[in-house]
């Protein structure tokens, strides 16, 4: 598809579809099925460029302005990258499955997780990311260019959080869990800046 050229007849047909609002008559679920199929291909960016070039984004992807994603990634990571490049507003009109939403939420939190954040904000970021539960997903997301300036910091922070023994939370009373967890997170943060 990378070198694929659309013929004149197909261009005219796509223009007609765009003007007729035919896509608006399709179900949200059908739209997502086609989007997911394109995300699973190695030419997802080309698909979204085509939608943009022929104005086939109404009403489902009206917030699409940047169609580029790293085509070597999983469908979930491609979608998260597209969301990030489109101000996290791309999936507002379509039924995005939870596994895709997970990656979008994680990427948004990873972008917000910066080295110069105040400690309380960094703690909130760590709690949102839940490194123990989402380690595999974050490893894939950290390879995105959008995180390149912060990748080393996040990787070091993740390593330090994962190195802490959160199993000790089982041994403390319910009243103490929050304080012990906070202590472990602060220790991981301190080790990250050391």
What spans do the regions from the language model cover?
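Short, polar/flexible loop-turn hinges at active-site or ligand-entry regions and domain interfaces
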Residues: 2-8
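Short amphipathic alpha-helical interaction patches enriched in hydrophobic/aromatic residues
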Residues: 1-2, 21
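Conserved, hydrophobic alpha-helical core segments of structured domains
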Residues: 12, 16-149
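Charged substrate- and nucleic-acid-binding regions of tRNA-handling and nucleotidyl-transfer enzymes
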Residues: 1, 130-194
């Amino acid at each position: 598809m990378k070198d694929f050229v659309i013929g004149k007849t197909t261009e005219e047909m796509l223009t007609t579809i765009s003007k007729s609002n035919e896509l608006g008559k399709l179900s949200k679920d059908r739209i997502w099925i086609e989007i997911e199929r394109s995300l699973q291909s190695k030419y997802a960016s080309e698909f979204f460029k085509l939608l943009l070039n022929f104005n086939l984004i109404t009403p489902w992807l009206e917030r699409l302005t940047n169609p580029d994603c790293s085509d070597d990634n999983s469908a979930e990571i491609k979608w998260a990258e597209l969301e990030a490049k489109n101000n996290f507003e791309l999936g507002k009109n379509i039924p995005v499955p939870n596994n895709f939403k997970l990656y979008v939420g994680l990427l948004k939190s990873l972008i917000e997780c910066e080295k110069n954040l105040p400690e309380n904000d960094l703690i909130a970021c760590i709690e949102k990311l839940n490194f123990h539960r989402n380690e595999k997903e974050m490893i894939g997301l950290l390879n995105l260019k959008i995180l390149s300036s912060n990748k080393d910091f996040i990787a070091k922070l993740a390593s330090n959080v994962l190195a802490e023994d959160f199993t000790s939370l089982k041994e403390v009373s319910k009243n103490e869990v929050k304080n012990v967890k906070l202590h472990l997170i602060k220790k991981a943060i301190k080790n990250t800046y050391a």
